[in-house]
């Protein structure tokens, strides 16, 4: 049963990532604008900004 639930969760994660299209920031409505709060260094911020991990803001 655990394997089944894990498989379903994995499918949802893959669909979510494919749906937001993290590799094409121009088509990504989920990207974070400059100055907004971010969590991970490489994901989330609109290009050309990156997440400043010291301040947790896109810059």
Swiss-Prot record:
Keywords of this entry: Calcium channel impairing toxin, Disulfide bond, Ion channel impairing toxin, Knottin, Neurotoxin, Secreted, Signal, Toxin, Voltage-gated calcium channel impairing toxin
Disulfide bonds: 31-46, 38-51, 45-58
Keyword Secreted part of the UniProt annotation: yes
Gene Ontology MF terms in the entry: calcium channel regulator activity; toxin activity
Organs and tissues of expression: Expressed by the venom gland.
Lineage top rank: taxon: Eukaryota
Subcellular location: Secreted
Signal peptide: 1-19
Family: Belongs to the venom Ptu1-like knottin family.
Domain characteristics, as noted in the entry: The presence of a 'disulfide through disulfide knot' structurally defines this protein as a knottin.
Its job: Binds reversibly and blocks P/Q-type voltage-gated calcium channels (Cav).
Record protein name field: U-reduvitoxin-Pr6a
Species, as recorded: Platymeris rhadamanthus (Red spot assassin bug)
């Amino acid at each position: 049963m655990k394997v089944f639930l894990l498989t379903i969760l994995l499918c949802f994660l893959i669909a979510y990532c494919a749906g937001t299209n993290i590799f094409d920031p121009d088509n990504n409505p989920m990207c974070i604008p400059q100055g907004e709060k971010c969590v991970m260094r490489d994901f989330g911020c609109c290009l050309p900004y990156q997440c400043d991990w010291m301040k947790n803001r896109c810059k």
